[in-house]
């Protein structure tokens, strides 16, 4: 097979991040230097993000049967790289006090970003599976990076065992679909699996097993039980990546599969997804109400957010354009709000060897010690709650409009109810940072240069959330560029 210059340009973001991994590995082997490795990784991500300008100029490019580049893939690639960049910025101050090898953290993040980029452009079940594994496997190490601390090691082992089981279900489901369709390409599967044979036992079993695997990766009910424990045990920078990039890449490829293989989006499957959406929204919000640990709260709330996102998948058959816009706007808002929230946790916490702030009470009076981190955390909670003048509100509005447009009143009502429940715990977390501590421990905290840099990144996230919440037009224009024309079965 001959690769043309056009195809090479289309693969630029992927190639740049792969090159970054190679350079980081060689640098670690030559001489360990925390600052150099972090700078190399961040530079690689920035170059990969900039290369999307040239990729977009090409339009639609089929690089191989497995890798398809278009506006849709570019949009989700950008979100994945931004998540990786934020994780690197938050990890640097956290790792400064780490007593073991620091540099491998950045290499693992870069490998996971490769998986996310591959998922954004996946056009085939094989590349989908490779992308999911490339994204998931580095997370085992990232979650357990603070292995001297028992919760981190426990979380890593739990995630590894359950993720391995979920991957087995996913792979077996793909094998069953291949047995019926005779092809693993999304488009070819869409042509083979017509409405007449979608109810065949092999196809139903394959779709069901794939749904189990994907449900685990996306923390959807009833496969979400690992989420709060893993979020709590993982270091704050890893939590930022786990909450954003791992969800964005997988959701992007699932939506492409539903768009290009419409038979996979059957009425039966939509009913199951509807049940999962309602259960995820209710379970995530109700469980988050009782949480005193901030990271567990964000873990449960992520379950409800993926429930809201399922609405976009369910309405895909009725309004494909609106469904894609909804998912893209919601995920962009969720990315910046989650990055900002976990970044604020990383900045507000003590250095690694003194532990992280976990309880909500630990954040009481944060405004008087670290005012920027407190304001950012408060704004991020408001955005996650969907309060007006934040990007989170625009995302929720699109979800509700998509439900109304498709006459899914029961699902729309559940989104409104879930958002109302979520307001309670988000507002509680947003308000507590401004309350003074009773022990008068309200003196400003001493900060390092690296913490100031991480604070700056969280501040940028907050500005984006507010600016796009007030004036969402630039983001809406971007999402319109990132629309896939629906296939007709």
From Swiss-Prot:
Top-level taxon of origin: Bacteria
GO biological process, one term: ATP synthesis coupled electron transport
Any one GO molecular-function label of the UniProt entry: NADH:ubiquinone reductase (non-electrogenic) activity
UniProt keyword terms in alphabetical order: Cell inner membrane, Cell membrane, Membrane, NAD, Quinone, Translocase, Transmembrane, Transmembrane helix, Transport, Ubiquinone
Reactions this protein catalyses: a quinone + NADH + 5 H(+)(in) = a quinol + NAD(+) + 4 H(+)(out)
Pfam families reported in the protein's UniProt record: Proton_antipo_M
InterPro entries: NADH-Q_OxRdtase_suN/2, ND/Mrp_TM
Record carries keyword Ribosomal protein: no
Membrane topology: Multi-pass membrane protein
EC number: 7.1.1.-
Residue intervals passing through the bilayer: 8-28, 35-55, 75-95, 105-125, 127-147, 159-179, 203-223, 235-255, 271-291, 303-323, 329-349, 374-394, 407-427, 456-476
Subcellular location: Cell inner membrane
GO cellular component, one term: plasma membrane
Subunit structure comment from the entry: NDH-1 is composed of 13 different subunits. Subunits NuoA, H, J, K, L, M, N constitute the membrane sector of the complex.
Role according to the record: NDH-1 shuttles electrons from NADH, via FMN and iron-sulfur (Fe-S) centers, to quinones in the respiratory chain. The immediate electron acceptor for the enzyme in this species is believed to be ubiquinone. Couples the redox reaction to proton translocation (for every two electrons transferred, four hydrogen ions are translocated across the cytoplasmic membrane), and thus conserves the redox energy in a proton gradient.
Record HAMAP family: NDH1_NuoN_1 (MF_00445)
Family label: Belongs to the complex I subunit 2 family.
Protein name: NADH-quinone oxidoreductase subunit N
